[in-house]
Amino acid sequence: MCIRDRCIAAVSVGDGSAVVMKYKYKTYVVGCGGNYFSGSAVCDIINTLGSSNIDYIILPEDSEKSLSGVRRVKETYRISSAVTATDRIKDGFSFDSVVSLNGNSAEITDGKLKITVQDSRVYVSFGDSLSEISFGDVNDGSDAGLLICRGLTGYEKSDIILVSTDKTDIGDLPSQKVILTSQNGTVLFTLSHNGKMTYRRMA
């Protein structure tokens, strides 16, 4: 999840879970987008660290509960910024046609973009930058798991944004939609636990 103490993104899929990250001297609390009631993981983390030590709360937007959770946490704890995925990409992107890679081992080169799927992980090379997008362990066979997005090299040249958690197109297992941007372009990825993925380059 971290390389040399630098985290790009880590997002909990499990309901009620949360992850703490530090990146470029900022502290981020990333929640699952559920209902952040008193005593939930996000609130416990805030109480433990102290609100003055947290710079951002980031919550994927997947339900009305998520939106109400953002407002309550922000108002109660006076965090400097609480954002959802659509805050980052509300104007949207225009993408080319979908390209699919199935199975646990595949590789494709598309101009300066090189994608390798191996053991349910996706390695994305954009020139000097290399990023990994993957799921962590699924707890007890449930849908709860950890999506890990990290810059392996050239981390300062790339940006990874969680778009949504989705269960619609890959059976009962969750999939994740992620936008990755570097100096060579922008790509939207959809990744599942079983190694299937699609990507769309920005038009």
PLM regions: where:
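Non-globular, low-confidence helical/coil segments that flank catalytic cores
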Residues: 4-203
